[in-house]
Amino acid sequence: MFQRARSSRLPLKLSRQGRRYSSHYARTPEPAPPEIAHLIATYAQHLPRPLTLGTLLATGRPLTAESVQTSVSYAQAEIPRRLATRIRSLEGLPFIVGTNPYIARTLNGFRKSFLWSATYPAVKNLEENAAFATQLETLVQDHANDIPTMAKG
């Protein structure tokens, strides 16, 4: 690391070895705000309820206001749980993976969607269900490219 100058009268000089690394590319992922982190922790404690084929068939026929209400209640309970699980998984990745901009973008999208789904008011009638379904379609479109985006990183 230190080299003697050719003349013994000159001081030691420091030679650089290795590469220079910049923190420009590897930014620390933004932590979730405390209120969101607490909400995520609350939902992540509960395991997702499985959805069986029998349940799907029983819920869909005949289509009544009650079956629609049952379906939307299930969706409102499960979407935040499953998003919280995914968020926890992404937050648990090693630091170097979490600094990847594609992973960080997906994580932020999951957090935004989680906050929306966890704080959405309970659906009580068919009109509210239509509005919820429209918002849910937008949410699905927002996450349509998550897997290809994460594959880039």
Segments the model singles out, each with a brief description of its role:
Residues 1-47:
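N-terminal mitochondrial targeting presequence
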